[in-house]
């Protein structure tokens, strides 16, 4: 495509260059790079409400959703000087200068460099010490379909309501569901992870045939896994309203709870979501106005510790944590020699 086929978008007081706008990004949908830009412009107010002010990790797809990708925490060289950034860290202490989703112009810039959606930190760049989101990732294991994930989400809602905590569901844009809890910014990510470990364990106790808190895949069986480690410090999660790198342009879409029982996630795409929002509004529109307390879940975590339960295993890239059991799959631990 010739260079003069590029387009310029005026958004949030900026002129953002979009190169190769007619490149097909989602073949099954017949949707282009500029269709993706247009989608984000259409739902911009809602996207600002969930992503605004958060650091973001870039995942770049130069050839669209079906092509190869690479992750990039650092803003690339040659980026415009108006981009806002903040310093983020990895579990081993390495720092990067990451993009901050300061406004919609930053999202359009990210699309232009090949991002389809963004992976967001659970805190605002202005307050990196305090997570203001708890993220419950309901992950289907092998042999599990969306009906089981749906059932697990409703079980999770019931437990949260019992604890006086308001949760907000969304599709992942793929096979699972997320439930977000907007928190008062009073706790760090270590506390949030501990809270979700306790939640996962209690859900497994109540629904052992449906839900598992087992970190090791060999122990999960055909159950829905509550991935508590998505709340570990420095972890990012794919943000609400962003399109996934799937050929059909599926979107990670916030839902009302009554929609969980009937939603068909693959039908929620960059073509259908704007009209859906116009018709029934933004289910997460007032979430930030009602921040929740983590204390009921932390009390549950304390009760587990008092009962002798150790911490749950951490991902391999994290240093060994106090109270963590041996970081080895149970089958391997059983095979280890007893002698020195």
Model-derived features: positions:
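SsDNA-processing nucleotidyl-transfer enzymes
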Residues: 2-12, 41-142, 146, 150, ...
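Catalytic palm subdomain of template-directed nucleic-acid polymerases
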Residues: 180-193
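Long, well-ordered alpha-helical scaffolding segments within enzyme catalytic domains
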Residues: 39, 146-165, 192-208
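Short beta-strand
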Residues: 59-61, 167-173, 214-218
């Amino acid at each position: 495509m010739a260079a003069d086929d590029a387009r310029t978008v005026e958004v949030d007081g900026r002129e953002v260059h979009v190169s190769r706008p007619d490149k097909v990004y989602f073949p099954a949908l017949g949707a282009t790079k500029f269709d993706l830009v247009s989608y984000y412009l259409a739902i911009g107010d809602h996207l600002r409400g969930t992503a605004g002010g958060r650091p973001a990790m870039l995942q770049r797809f130069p050839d669209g959703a079906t092509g190869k990708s690479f992750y990039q925490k650092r803003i690339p060289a040659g980026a415009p000087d108006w981009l806002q950034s903040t310093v983020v860290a990895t579990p081993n202490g390495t720092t990067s200068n990451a993009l901050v989703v300061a406004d919609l112009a930053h999202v359009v810039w990210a699309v232009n460099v090949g991002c389809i959606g963004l992976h967001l930190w659970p805190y605002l760049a202005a307050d990196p010490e305090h997570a203001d989101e708890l993220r419950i990732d309901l992950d289907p294991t092998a042999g599990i379909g969306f009906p089981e994930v749906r059932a697990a989400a409703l079980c999770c809602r019931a437990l949260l309501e019992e604890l006086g905590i308001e949760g907000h569901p969304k599709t992942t844009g793929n096979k699972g569901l997320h439930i977000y809890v907007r928190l008062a910014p009073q706790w760090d990510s270590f506390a949030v992870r501990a809270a979700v470990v306790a939640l996962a364990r209690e859900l497994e106790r109540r629904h052992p045939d449906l839900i598992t808190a087992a970190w090791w895949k060999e122990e999960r069986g055909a159950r829905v896994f509550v991935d508590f480690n998505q709340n570990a410090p420095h972890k990012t999660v794919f943000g609400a309203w962003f399109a996934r790198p799937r050929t059909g342009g599926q979107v990670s879409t916030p839902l009302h709870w009554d929609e969980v029982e009937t939603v068909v996630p693959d039908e929620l795409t960059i073509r259908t979501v704007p009209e859906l929002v116009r018709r029934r509004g933004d289910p997460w529109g007032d979430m930030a106005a009602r921040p929740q307390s983590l204390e009921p879940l932390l009390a549950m975590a304390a009760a587990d510790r008092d009962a002798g339960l150790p911490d749950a295993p951490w991902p391999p890239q994290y240093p060994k944590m106090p109270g963590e059991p041996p970081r080895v799959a149970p089958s391997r631990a059983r095979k280890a020699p007893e002698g020195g």
